[in-house]
Amino acid sequence: MKTLLLTLVVVTIVCLDLGYTRRCFITPDVRSERCPPGQEVCYTKTWCDGFCSSRGKRVDLGCAATCPTPKKKGIDIICCSKDNCNTFPKWP
C-alpha cells in the first residue's frame, strides 16, 4: 500500500512539472503571457530608430528558446529565465 501511494505521489509530481511553461512579458501590450512550449527564456530587446532622440529607445519583450543575438550594431538584448523577469525598462 505504501509503495502504491509513493508511486502515485511521484507520478503526480512528474506530471505537474511537465506541464509548466515560462511566463514572460510580451509586447506590444506589455502583458504577462505563457510562453509556447520549448521557449523558456524571456528577453528584452532595445534599439534606437529615427525617433530615438524624442521618444527614447524602442522596446521589444518576448519569449525565446535561446537568447536572441543582435543582428545589427546598436541593438541591446538582455535575457533571463525566471517568470516575468523581462520587465519594461525604466529610463532616467
From Swiss-Prot:
CC annotations in GO: extracellular region
Subcellular location field: Secreted
Distribution of this protein across tissues and organs: Expressed by the venom gland.
Signal peptide: 1-21
Domain of life: Eukaryota
Pfam families: Toxin_cobra-type
MF term (GO), any: toxin activity
Disulphide connectivity of cysteines: 24-42, 35-63, 48-52, 67-79, 80-85
Keywords for this protein: Acetylcholine receptor inhibiting toxin, Disulfide bond, Ion channel impairing toxin, Neurotoxin, Postsynaptic neurotoxin, Secreted, Signal, Toxin
Record-stated family: Belongs to the three-finger toxin family. Long-chain subfamily. Type II alpha-neurotoxin sub-subfamily.
Function, in words: Binds with high affinity to muscular (alpha-1/CHRNA1) and neuronal (alpha-7/CHRNA7) nicotinic acetylcholine receptor (nAChR) and inhibits acetylcholine from binding to the receptor, thereby impairing neuromuscular and neuronal transmission.
Protein name: Long neurotoxin 2
